Structures are given as structure tokens and as C-alpha cells.
Amino acid sequence: MESDEMNWLQDLFIRLLSPWIPIVRKIQPKVRYRVLTACFMADLVLFCIVRYVLMKESYFYNTVCGIFLMLVIAIFSLDKKLERRKWHKGLSVAWFGMCIMFTISDFFVSKKACGLGIILALVLPGVFFVWQNNSRKDLLWKSLKDAVKISFLLMAVISFLFRPFFEGGRYAGIFTNPNTFGLYLYVIFAIYMSDLDWNVETGKKFRKAWTTYIQLALVLFYISVSQARTAMLAVCGILILWVILRICLGKTNHKWKETVKGFLLLALITVVCYPVFFAGVRHIPNLIGHPILFEEDVLYLSNGEKIEGIGDKVLAESDAIESVQIPEPKEKKEFKENSILGRLIASLDGNSTLNKISNGRITIYKAYLKKLNWKGHRRITLTVNGKKVAHAHNNWLQFAYTYGVPAMFFYLIITILSVIRSIQFYWTNRRRNATYAFLIPGICVGFVIATMTECLFLPFEVFPAFMYWFAFGDLFDNSLAEAAE
């Protein structure tokens, strides 16, 4: 984007970060890489660090720590002179328009979770700009991927050794909620699928790639025992996207063998490893005899019930929460309001079966729809029929409720562009950036699917949201498309 505003912002990044370049160049590349990997690992477990190390439970502390980590990542990613980059005009307008709407809403309605517009307008674009100027961006992405892989493997070891599986229940790994576990898993699945895509694209032999298949099988196993339906849909969407893209590429270059081989190997290894993994989670914690149980642990049963249910926790909120009463769904109901919002609410009425299948989400959607306005609300949560609901279980609806309807329209444009641009990125840069080319569309498509029934948007509260916002760094850069094959 060639506007004066974007040039001004990029010039600001150049002035602030250029003095660090000679200092960072004195540090060995291996050390810089390890620092980046450590920062991403810290960001992945940021919530745990704030809560159990700093003994805090606050959006403020998470945000401060997250911004600090982004600053460190930006500095240690410097390797040459910073220059202006061409940013995609449509995406830039939608992105910064969304940020402006968020900030305006924060100004008129003070929020418990404020400042998202500033973070997305100034903090993350600074890292985007540095990465776009780096001569080895593939290594930067490798540091992120390695951080997630290391964290996942550590989590798997702890889970197999100390987190027991209860018969008739849903497995949550090291988390207290299997749905939260599942949302992290779809991000991990996208990362390993990008490795599989690289293996297929480059014709890598199985003896050199078998660990990728084993770890993908482990992710699919965890998804299965967590029974997290949203995560299952996201994983299916990512897998279907990969198959479609590889089929389209096969029609272009007439290379089908590696794609079919990769898919069949994944299916075979998953089937073979599943009973082994299942036996591990059932018996190893009992053999060790030192199970790790948290005070917040809730046993979610396969039939939808839960023992000692305490609700999903997103932010620590102590003030009064806005309340709304929604009548129980009836089989038939006349709705006389003729507005678009009224007709939408009416279409949700009378659908008791769908409401049960979606675990009451229809009632939640109706409650949030009735509270929409142009300025937004102080909170994310809402009390529906006397019961506290953590969030809207839909990102578009949550943005409309928290930041106002105009902000939701900008976010809608952003999500559409993210899917289109990420697929374009893969199609034109799969060879140049083979090690992470599929990660970008995998993250974007998985996130859009997941946020149809869940709420993920604060980058330093939940890692899937961070990964989605962070993926825009490559989508912003127009010069990649110009230099593509």
C-alpha cells in the first residue's frame, strides 16, 4: 500500500528499530534463533506464566507480557537495513479500518479487555514489517513452528505420564477443558500439515519424514479423545483444503504420486498408532501413580454432561455482568418485527433440536443479537436466562457485541480476505516457502471454521488467535506475489 499513512507507519518502524540492527548483527544467528524460539514458546504458554509464575490473573498482565515478547521478537529478527514494503491496499484498508473501529469503541465504552485496536495497528505490524525485510524469513517461521512442536511434545509427555483418562469422559490433556485443548490442537495440526505438504512438494523419503506422520497421528488421536466438535470441524477443513490444493496442483504439474502416498501413509499410521496412544493414556498415569489434577478440572462426559461444571473462563471479571432473558425455543412463533435483525432472531426461534445439538448456542446467539448496538459493550460475557455465558461462541457476533456493528463489518472483510489471500500465497509461493507455505492457509481456514462456534480474538489470551493475527504478516506483503514464479 503506497498511501502516506502506510509510509508514515513504516518510516516510524524504521526509525525505532534501525538503531538495533548493528547490535543484533553481533549476536550469532544460532543464538538469535534460539531466543526467537524461546519467545514463541513463552507466548504459547503466556496464560500459564502470568497465572502460575507472576501469580496474576489479568488481561493487563497478559497484554504487557505479550507486547514485550513481540518487541523482543522484532529486535532479534533484524538482519539487514529496513526498507519500505508494498502492502496490499485492500487488506491494509480493512485491517486499519477495523483497528480504528476497535479504538473508537474503546474510547466511548471503557472495556475490561481494551487496546486490541492499538495492538493490531502498531505492535503486530511492526513485527510483520521486520519479518518482511528479513533475508531468511523461512528460518523465522521455523523458529515459530519449532516452538509449537517442542511445546506440544512436552505437553504430550506430561499428559501420557500424569494426566489420567476417565472412562466415559472427554480427554483434556494438560488443559482443564477438552474444548480448549481441541482449539490448540487444530493449530498444531496445521503446523504439522505444513511439514507434510513440504515433504510431498519436495518428494522427501519416508525414512526422513516418519516423525511428521507419527506426530500428526498423535494430534488426530488427541482430537478424537477430546471429542471437541469445533476442533474436529477445523481439522477436517484444513485436511480437505490440503487435498483440494494438491489435486489442483496435480492437474497443473501431473504429479499425483507423492500426494496420494502422503495421504495414505497418514491414514495408515493414524490407524496403527491410535490403539497404542489410547492404551498409553489409559494405563501409563495409573502405573506412574502420581496424577496431576487441577482445582479447575471438570470431567466433561461423552453424553454432553459434566461433573462439577463451573463454566468456561475467559477473563477474570468481578463487576456486574449485563443480563438478558431469552424465552425457550418453541416449535412455532410469529415474529412481527420487520428489521433484518428481527428476521434473523425469528429464524433462530422454534429450533429446539438445533439448540440442543449446538449445546444451547442458538439461545446464546439470540441473546447477543438482541444486545447489539453501534458503540459496543464493556464486557465479553453476558448473563443469559440467569446463567453466565463466557462469550458469544461466534467471533463475528462477539466483535459486533463488544466493539459495535461497524467493527464487525470490517472484521468480516478481514476474514474473507484472509482466506483468499492465504490460498493465493500458497499457490504462488509454495516452492519458495515450502517449509511453511501451507501453514498460512491452514491457520486462516481453520480459524474461520473454529470461530463459527467459538470465540477467539485476544492474541495474548489464546494462542490460536495469536497465530491467526500473526499469519497476516505474509498476507500484507504484496512484493511476494510480484516476485512469485
What are these regions (language model features)?
Residues 403-445:
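Hydrophobic transmembrane alpha-helices and their immediate junctions
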Residues 1-100, 195-208, 254-263, 476-485:
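Transmembrane signal-anchor hairpin modules in multi-pass inner-membrane enzymes, especially those
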Residues 440-448, 456-485:
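Transmembrane alpha-helices of multi-pass inner-membrane enzymes
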Residues 139-167, 176-251, 274-276, 280:
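Alpha-helical transmembrane segments of multi-pass inner-membrane proteins
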Residues 309-390, 405-409:
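TM-adjacent membrane-interface loops and short helices in multi-pass inner/ER membrane proteins
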Residues 72-81, 99-157, 182-198, 249, ...:
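Transmembrane alpha-helical segments and their membrane-water interfaces
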Residues 225, 249-349:
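A membrane-periplasm/extracellular boundary helix in multi-pass inner-membrane enzymes
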Residues 45-67, 81-90, 99-123, 135-140, ...:
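Interfacial transmembrane-helix termini
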